[in-house]
Structures are given as C-alpha cells and as structure tokens.
C-alpha cells in the first residue's frame, strides 16, 4: 500500500524518502515509542488510538529524523490531533511532544525502559520494540546474548543487498569497483552488503546504470549468503525452486550457471520473472503455478529448493509490520504447512537427489526441528549441510538452511 501511494506522480523524491523512513521506522520502534508516550500521559487509556498513532509517529520524527526540525514535527502533529480530537487533545499533544523534544537523550538511555522494576522480558520488549511472545521465545531458544542480538537487529534497517551478475562479462571488474565503496559491510562474490540508504549513484560507480543493464540486482545479502553457505554451486541439476516467489533465488541460481525451473502457488509473484531474465541476459526460465504441497513433476529434479513460507522472524528489520501482525497461534499452521511441503519434496526426489530447506525465521520449531521431524520419518535421509539462523551484524537478517540427500 505504501509503495503504491508513493508511486503516484508529482511526489518530491525527498518527501517519498521521508515517508518511507517514517513508516518503516515507526513500525520498527512502535513498542518503544508507545512506552515513551505512555510515560508522559496522565491517563494513556483515555487517548484515542488515532491520536496515539499521531503522537508516536511525531515522537519518532523528533527522536530519529535529525534533518527535520523538532518544531516542525510538533506543529504538524498538533494540527493533526486538533482536526481529529479537538483543542483539548491538541493541547495535550503539544505538551507531550515538547517534553520529548526538550530532552531527546533521555529516551536513548536503556534505563528509561527499566522503570517500575520491570522484569527482564518486559524491559527487552519495551526497549527493543518487540512483542513479548517473540522476545520470550528467543530468550528460551537462543539464550540471552543471542536473543538480544536478534532483538537489536530488528530495530535497524537492513543493509542494501546487491548481487553482481556472475553470468555477464565484466562481473569481477564491477565487483572489485564496488568493494571500494565506503562502509562496505560484506563483500563475498557475487554478494555485497552496503549500509541502508546508500546512494546508488556515487561518483565513479554508476550503480543505476549497472542495474538497468542487468549487471547488478537488488537482493537481500543474507538470502544470498545462505545459498552460498549451503553449497548451491554443487547442487545436482536441474534445480526446482518450488516456492520461488518473485524469483530472487531462482535468478541467483541461474546467474551461477545452474539449470533451474520455478513454481509458486501465486502466479502473480512469478509475473516479472520473464522481464528479469531478459534484463539479466539469461536464458528463459520455465515457471508455472503450483502448490509445493503437491509436486506433480514429470521428471524428478536433481535438487528441490524449498524456500518455505514461515513466520519471517529473521527478517523483521525488512518487514517490521510482521511482528505486530503475527500471533503465537499462527505458528502451528505454518509448521503443518512446512511439514506437508517437506514430505511432498521428499516424495518428488529421485535417489541421489538433494532437498534444500530454507526459511527466514528464528524459530527452531520451523527450522532444525522441522528437519529432524522429516529425518525421523525417513531415516535414510542424510543431512549434508546446515546453516543456523544466527545473528550476523553485517547481514542484519537471519536465515536457516539445510541440505538433505535422499540415498
């Protein structure tokens, strides 16, 4: 919805950038902002939801948007509250936001969120702006240090991930040129991770031209790295990407020289694959609509890549709305779906084939335990490689992956 609204003609690029930062930043830090505002209100429960949203959005702008003067944030927010809830609420909004603007450093101090002698879980939930059930699950499954690393990662925008097209002449030269950019977070051919918000047209390296010419693509660096760590160049061919989505991993495989074909339950997601293969100068990739729970393939592929639907808890920095939409009760249905997909993939493989299971979540029940459950039902399966969903400061996101061989 945001992308569609911002695609309208006539919007100043600066306004488009600010709107994007406000929406994503607010979603990442909503819990922290709501706690700040609640501490400054006499009766938080009496404040209408719409007014609370205005207050927390303005608080984000005051605290985290250095280029916007605090008085401007206070002004538009008070005007918005007056229109929605009258003069009384507007006066309250003015007082609250001026207090925030007067002492912004106070809200950067973790001790502010430890008030009321709260338990550690409540502090972590407040400070890292994460629903308690997610924080509790990570504390239980990962230990405090790793849980805190995951919590911290989801409060920051993810790095800009780029993939150099290894199938094109000049790929190594372009990669070498890009590694000279400042503040590179990761450079592992063909993958680069740059700081979020990196200008794509710096002097000397015309990234926009490289994108247009098919020498370069945007793709999560963490999504690329998990495939590399799982040894994708050694996977038997052809590779069937059974949950291809928009085809990011499909195209990465094709650029690496793999024979690949793709499917997804939602045909619309695959609609841009033809344009992308043309931009990248790749041979056409067969793609069709199909459910990964029923793989009716004419011939068994060498490898089935199952990038399974999951809770997405490893990519909350990129999809911060997910943490507010997800509920603990969602997990059981996802685990059942993953089990059905794994069984279908196992059945579709010929002896000697590989099943590659990938998720973008931090939840052992969807990751290691899903693989263990499949292995307990098919004891002949061999686990050849496994990548845990561990925090990685350079990548800012966490993916799990496993390679299973069917003897």
Where are these regions (language model features)?
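Glycine-rich S-adenosyl-L-methionine
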Residues: 136, 265-274, 322-349
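Conserved SAM-binding loop of SAM-dependent methyltransferases across substrates and taxa
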Residues: 246-257
